[in-house]
Regions:
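Outer-membrane beta-barrel proteins and related beta-barrel translocases across Gram-negative bacteria
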Residues: 22-479
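Positively charged n-region of N-terminal signal peptides that target proteins for export
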Residues: 1-6
Length: 479
């Protein structure tokens, strides 16, 4: 047993040493145990252990650690850090003047300087809330008692034994609820109202709006935006008849959702639905189209155009404006997606193709990345936490390249890998063969990690056998 272990240790040292020698101490591989790469010119070092499972990497001032899929951490010299544990279970982010963490986004702590984007709030949703806003500090223990500022689209929310009592405030309007949602009183500057839902309710603000309902949602009457140049009147006996009128837009609905007509005088188009949302006809200059779902749909809305063929089989979304061109083709929602985008002002370009679960492809400003497989990335296309912690576990093949011909390829987490940069080329199929070419005059080929190794350079040629550091040398300086 000891002799076998000693032999394995000796072979491991020889194999790693031969690899390092071949690459000027910038590369050492022993698949799948470890993979070490470094570049002094790029200020870069990377170590991977057990394929994609463990990672330690430094890039300039930033250091990354990963124990996939359990743990990921990135930190820089200024103490800014980001940590994920079994994403999305736990996450932590630290800036110079703020700190936040979350557990499943239900337990969240976020405190620091508002200038850094911190909300200065903590909560265990939906039970406990604590924070500080411009109005002051707040705390709440739902449904017992508490006050919230700037939550759920309201300036203030207060409650006691909810739904027994609750109060909301928004833009000067206060609503006191008793046995929510059944009874409420509305108050504010020049504003009053009440409701006994769903029987009857009314509210009004002088010169701004008037609202009434009876047997909600059957009968309701509303006068809205009275203080603007586009006031709106709404009358309804739902679902039999609904009328909406304003100087810029009018609509009529009969037996909702079967028949409706919308006339938009501001944007100069007319739309008929019969029934909504299956059949729709739109006529106008910048707004026009025909929809007959699930067979066909082709609708243009100013700079946007949307088409369906055999919904939900094939969909095309397009946007063409002075600033951007964007097109997305989709098959069965997330099964296949192809996005093309160009920003005219900056010249930035993007191409992204996802074919779930087989592969993903992305090209950003001429730099391409292809990976196989793609299990969850199509559903969360810009999620960096998934990219860092989960994606490397199932990406059995990756390739990156640019328009200058530089290329990096990895198969089965570097069982086979290749790198090309300018005239320099290196590749390896572990443990059979390893090859490097720095120029037309310099090359290095090794079999079984150095059992047989042949080098050619400006100083001549050399053959090494059996992992030995000395060998047969001939050529220019052989004598």
């Amino acid at each position: 047993m000891k002799q076998g272990f000693s032999f394995l240790l000796m072979l491991t040292i020889l194999w790693s040493a031969s690899s390092a020698l071949a690459y000027d101490a910038t590369l050492s591989t022993l698949w799948p145990l470890w993979d070490y790469r470094a570049s002094d010119a790029a200020d870069y070092k990377s170590t991977h252990l057990l394929g994609p499972l463990l990672k330690y990497e430094t890039k300039g001032f930033e250091t990354e650690y990963a124990l996939r899929p359990l743990f990921y951490r990135a930190v820089d010299d200024e103490g800014v850090s980001e940590t994920d544990v079994l994403y999305p279970l736990f996450g932590h982010k630290k800036e110079q003047d703020s700190s936040s963490f979350h557990i499943l986004r239900l337990l969240t702590f976020d405190h620091g300087s508002p200038a850094s984007g911190s909300r200065n709030r903590s909560y265990l949703f939906p039970f406990f809330f604590y924070g500080e806003e411009e109005q002051g500090k707040y705390k709440a223990f739902f449904p017992i008692h508490g006050t919230l500022y700037n939550w759920f689209g309201r300036d203030r929310i207060s409650f006691t034994l909810f739904p027994l009592y609750g109060r909301t405030e928004r833009k000067g309007t206060r609503i006191d609820n008793v046995l929510w949602p059944f009874f409420a009183r509305i108050s504010g500057e020049n504003e009053s109202g009440f409701k006994a839902w769903p029987i009857y309710g009314q509210s009004q603000k002088e010169g701004v709006y008037r609202k009434k309902f009876f047997l909600w949602p059957v009968f309701f009457s509303e006068s809205l935006r009275l203080n603007t140049d586009n006031p709106q009147e709404v009358r309804a006996a739902w679902p039999f008849y609904i009328r909406k009128d304003s100087p810029k837009k009018s609509s009529r609905t009969i037996l909702w959702p079967f028949f409706s007509k919308v006339e938009n005088r501001e944007k100069e188009y007319v739309t008929w639905n019969a029934p909504w949302p299956l059949v729709r006809v739109t006529k106008g200059d910048k707004y026009h189209g025909l929809k007959i779902l699930p067979l066909f749909s082709d609708e243009t809305m100013d700079v946007k155009r949307e088409r369906w063929y055999l919904w939900p089989v094939y969909k095309i979304e397009e946007m063409n404006s002075e600033l951007i061109m964007r097109r997305r083709d989709r098959v069965l929602f997330f099964l296949y997606s192809d996005v093309r985008e160009v920003k005219y002002e900056t010249g930035d370009s993007l191409r992204r193709i996802d074919f779930w679960p087989f592969f993903g492809y992305k090209n950003v400003n001429g730099v391409s990345h292809l990976h196989v497989l793609s299990l969850v990335e199509p559903f969360f296309p810009n999620n960096q936490s998934i990219e860092r912690l989960w994606s490397p576990l199932w990406r059995v093949y990756q390739q990156k390249w640019d328009q200058q011909g530089n290329r990096v390829v990895s198969l089965l987490w570097n069982l086979y890998w290749s790198e090309k940069q300018g005239d320099r080329l290196a590749w390896e199929l572990f443990p059979v063969i390893q090859y490097r070419k720095d120029s037309q005059a310099e090359s290095d080929i090794s079999f079984l990690k150095g059992l047989v190794r042949y080098r050619k350079g400006l100083d001549g040629k050399q053959l090494n056998l059996f992992y030995l550091p000395w060998g047969i040398h001939w050529g220019r300086d052989a004598g």
